[in-house]
Curated annotation (Swiss-Prot):
Protein name according to UniProt: Small ribosomal subunit protein uS5
Region (Disordered): 1-61
Pfam families listed in its UniProt record: Ribosomal_S5 (PF00333), Ribosomal_S5_C (PF03719)
GO CC annotations on file: small ribosomal subunit
Organism of provenance: Mycoplasma pneumoniae (strain ATCC 29342 / M129 / Subtype 1) (Mycoplasmoides pneumoniae)
Domain notes: The N-terminal domain interacts with the head of the 30S subunit; the C-terminal domain interacts with the body and contacts protein S4. The interaction surface between S4 and S5 is involved in control of translational fidelity.
S5 DRBM domain ranges (all copies): 66-129
UniProt biased composition (Basic and acidic residues): 35-47
InterPro entries: Ribosomal_Su5_D2-typ_SF, Ribosomal_uS5, Ribosomal_uS5_bac-type, Ribosomal_uS5_C, Ribosomal_uS5_N, Ribosomal_uS5_N_CS, Ribsml_uS5_D2-typ_fold_subgr
Comp. bias (Polar residues): 1-21
Family that this chain belongs to: Belongs to the universal ribosomal protein uS5 family.
GO biological process: translation
HAMAP family for this protein: Ribosomal_uS5_B
Keywords, comma-separated and alphabetical: Ribonucleoprotein, Ribosomal protein, RNA-binding, rRNA-binding
Amino acid sequence: MTDQNQKANQGNGLQTTNLQAHAQRKHNLRPSSEGIKKAVSKKEGGGHNRNNQNRRFQKPAFKSEFEERIVKLKRISKTTKGGRNMRFSVLVVVGNRKGKIGYGIAKALEVPNAIKKAIKAAHNSLHTIEIHKGSIYHEVIGRSGASRVLLKPAPQGTGIIAGGAIRAIIELAGYSDIYTKNLGRNTPINMIHATMDGILKQLSPRRVAILRNKNLNEL
């Protein structure tokens, strides 16, 4: 009996030793809190550096000198055999306030697409105009259809006396002092056509001298 008890005690001791060794191995394999913190900080630091490197190669955002303004936005429909087709029509004016101005009209199924097309059309129809001390050289009347727009020069400090579609053209063109008045129909597209017609019809003293075959001093 004594030998059997001794053997049993020895077996229990071996099992206890094996369990302790197994627990120690698991404890060694388990990552420590310091190791986890180092790994996380290293990962975050590496990602931050990569982001900085990516920012170096990113191209700076291009900012256009032209300003866009939506003058008219409306929904239109076309009746066909299959039903009504709904679209959007947009009238846009673009200018750099330094003597370049243009306008465009476009249609599309969605508003963003119509705006993009109208802006592109406006950039393709840019005009270079003359500005004399923030105003125009002389009084002029622009015409388009049933619309007539009167443009008159104004002294400095007067400001822009205009409204609606006429004001969009005058402001984005770069004028600061001018009188305007609508003498006909107030359809936005016709008012813009008439305003541009009047602006482009003005003659500077140099152009008048060239047309009359005279010097500036003789005028």
